Amino acid sequence: MEQAGTRPAATEHPRLRRPMPWLLLLPLLLLLLLLLPGPAASQLRYSVPEEQAPGALVGNVARALGLELRRLGPGCLRINHLGAPSPRYLELDLTSGALFVNERIDREALCEQRPRCLLSLEVLAHNPVAVSAVEVEILDINDNSPRFPRPNYQLQVSESVAPGARFHIESAQDPDVGANSVQTYELSPSEHFELDLKPLQENSKVLELVLRKGLDREQAALHHLVLTAVDGGIPARSGTAQISVRVLDTNDNSPAFDQSTYRVQLREDSPPGTLVVKLNASDPDEGSNGELRYSLSSYTSDRERQLFSIDASTGEVRVIGGLDYEEASSYQIYVQATDRGPVPMAGHCKVLVDIVDVNDNAPEVVLTDLYSPVPENATPNTIVAVLSVNDQDSGPNRKVSLGLEATLPFRLNGFGNSYTLVVSGPLDRERVAVYNITVTATDGGIPQLTSLRTLKVEISDINDNPPSFLEDSYSIYIQENNLPGVLLCTVQATDPDEKENAEVTYSLLEREIQGLPVTSYVSINSASGSLYAVNSFDYEKFREFFVTVEAQDKGSPPLSSTVTANVYVVDMNDHAPHILYPTSTNSSAAFEMVPRTAPAGYLVTKVIAMDSDSGQNAWLFYHLAQTSDLDLFKVELHTGEIRTTRKMGDESGSTFNLTVVVRDNGEPSLSASVAITVAVVDRVSKILPDTQRHVKSPRTYSEITLYLIIALSTVSFIFLLTIIILSIIKCYRYTAYGTACCGGFCGVRERSPAELYKQANNNIDARIPHGLKVQPHFIEVRGNGSLTKTYCYKACLTAGSGSDTFMFYNTGAQTGPGPSGAQAAVTDSRNLTGQSGQNAGNLIILKNEAVSQNEPRQPNPDWRYSASLRAGMHSSVHLEEAGILRAGPGGPDQQWPTVSSATPEPEAGEVSPPVGAGVNSNSWTFKYGPGNPKQSGPGELPDKFIIPGSPAIISIRQEPTNSQIDKSDFITFGKKEETKKKKKKKKGNKTQEKKEKGNSTTDNSDQ
């Protein structure tokens, strides 16, 4: 039986029972997660200064929330920007949970001048679910200087303003907030003004300029002040504004005359208008307060007012009536000067006029006729004017004579009371266009009376002057790649003639420039003389040319003159640098090798580039843009040499990737880059390229190897065949001319060191003296290359060789005195094959010595292959310059490098490329490793040497020195398989040749 108040349990439908856990439990679970403290819901606050670089760390959100990212799994942590700011200033590193700056934040642009600048973020984590609010406050830095609304303020203050007057000045604005905003103002020192600051509101002040001392415009009409606003940042920033105070004038000064009393004398026959005196008064005020008006004061009598007047503006006192000495001998005139101020002020003076008694009637000159203008080519005695004279006096006072200035090209011819004015000299309108001829008439009275008459005679023009240019020549500089029609220059010619005789037209004289008429390059405006470019100029095609401009007037006949306009095409930076060495093929990096034992400063290679531009546009600068190890390599800025900065160690990698950028000095700058792979090896024999980078497939690799083997075999065969043929030719020449030349070697007596040093210079100079008894293919090379070393070589060339590659070998002889620390440099072999004069950095000297009669040594049949050369069959092996001078006990000698495939030690010599400017990569030399180098005495040769174009090392043997003959070294060729019997036979032949030759000597000076 059921209890009261209870209800039977309702039966639930099965379909409604299933979704209950998801519909009811999920909202409850989310609400519980939001209410519970801990990592599920929290708020983080960070602060970061503005202007931080992208990537700057703000904080680690995962660590602050206690989340382990390794348990969350990928993609379980993300960040939302509340308010969707654009751009996204902050980002979250999903791997470490670090919150970092994504883009540069400018607080002033983001929040303007709000006290707090916040970025609100939301961090969401899944499994377990966590929602965290993140507030990042952007802190202000003092990155803005105070700035006034206007840089200059103009104030106008009357000099009557009393001290204490105030003038409002606009305050400065600073986008920063807090202490970084404007804090103080400073005013430059002034005895008249001071600055008063009144607080207006928070971080805002009212500026007032206060007058503390009265102004006087007459002492200083303009005052310059500097107002400075300083913020409170560390370091403080400031901004300035210029304040110019102009003092306005008030009428506080009276006019004053130069003298209080003026005394003058005046003839009684002075006609009306005669100037009595010119008065001058001054007023230090300005404007209307300083403008003066002259007048006769009330103290002047009416009679004097009838005889004299004064000009109100100029102060000139003139006669207006007839004067008579018998009536009055003197007059007193009172004059006042009044300014035009609001309250006019006046100054006074007195003029005393004394009348001088003279003859009352002066002669009168009457112009009867005037023939003007007169042509400038008028002949002498041409009549210009007809004059007559009259005098009211009688007797001797009536007799009048006329006169002219003696310097005028005119004269007077008189008959009775009439005169004619005629031409007496040459006229030139360009020198004097108008003559104001003053005719003087004098009577015979006592005292004599004189009157003047001025005649204006104009000279008419004839075309007697050609146009004249303002400049002797014009120099026009125009940048290349100009637009057609651009104005080059305006030539101007003047013609001192007038009217049509002075109208000038311009034209170009016909001539050809590079086979084209001048009008194909330049046109001219016939009226203005403006020269225009017809086409675009190219500096690389031609750099300058000239045109001849003719100026011609329109006279009859026309006259003309010419001037030369030189047009110089100015180079533009329109060519990027071109990298000559090292070069890469098939978009692969150039390959260089460095031994692991290389010391600091080791020369890895040298980047050689050129620029087709000129001047500073062709100045090249080398930069290391990218490298695997930033502190292991460096590149010289101007030479392009890549060197090691420290000693290679075991910790160094096996290969390094370098990117060298070459920039020119143009505007804008152009650049080129080259990628270089540097391999670090223990020994030269281990130098192998990274074939995995460049070989695309085994088939391609096998094809390249096959082609390389065929090419090397062909070159070796041709080289050996050439050596044999040349040896036969030299032996034949020896028989024909009696010189010591056999076995591919020519002997010449060695010069003294002083001679070698004296003949070294910076220009290529090949000299073959008359009667030189030496083979023309034996030369000595001295010069300075692009490297920072000095070189000296002797080259033995084969007769008739068509190759542009020289083989240099060392003599071991003393080099002679030279600059301290001089080192060897490699010369481009192309400069030694008939192209002298094209490279100003080398010197070629042909020895002018007697031919040595010593018997040459026999070849040594010892050929050895180098492991590095075997590696060179698979890659491009570049070599480095060598031949460093060393001071030995007997004077300067040279260290002889050797290379042997059987030498495993790191001290063995290494093969490096010659990397100087203009160096042919086929010329190979050697460089010692960092270990103990082989010390060779004077006259010694290395045991082995590399033949260009052949993968072999040639043994160089040296016979013991003999006191009766010169030291000789020979390069011998042969194979290891030759028998000792063959050697003995050759030595026997050599002994027999010594007996025949006698005292012949050989000079071995190749390096």
Swiss-Prot record:
Q: Which residues cross the membrane?
A: 709-729
Give the matching CDD domains.
Cadherin_repeat (cd11304)
Q: Which residues form the signal peptide?
A: 1-42
Q: Which GO terms describe its biological process?
A: cell adhesion; homophilic cell adhesion via plasma membrane adhesion molecules; nervous system development; serotonergic neuron axon guidance
The positions flagged as glycosylation sites are: N280, N436, N586, N657
- What are the record's GO terms for cellular component? plasma membrane
List the membrane topology term(s).
Answer: Single-pass type I membrane protein
Region 4 X 4 AA repeats of P-X-X-P, as annotated, extends over: 856-951
Q: GO MF terms on file?
A: calcium ion binding
Q: Which UniProt keywords apply?
A: Calcium, Cell adhesion, Cell membrane, Glycoprotein, Membrane, Repeat, Signal, Transmembrane, Transmembrane helix
Basic and acidic residues composition-biased segments: 966-980
Role of this protein = Potential calcium-dependent cell-adhesion protein. May be involved in the establishment and maintenance of specific neuronal connections in the brain.
Origin organism is: Homo sapiens
* Chief location: membrane
Entries under InterPro entries matching the protein: Cadherin-like_dom, Cadherin-like_sf, Cadherin_C, Cadherin_CBD, Cadherin_CS, Cadherin_N, Protocadherin/Cadherin-CA
Q: Could you tell me which residue ranges the Cadherin domain spans?
A: 43-148, 149-257, 258-365, 374-469, 470-579, 594-691
Q: Where would I find the PXXP repeats?
A: 856-859, 889-892, 930-933, 948-951
- Which residues are on the Extracellular side of the membrane? 43-708
Localization (cell)? Cell membrane
**UniProt-listed Pfam families:** Cadherin (PF00028), Cadherin_2 (PF08266), Cadherin_C_2 (PF16492), Cadherin_tail (PF15974)
Per the UniProt topology annotation, the Cytoplasmic ranges are 730-1007
> What's the protein name?
Protocadherin alpha-C2
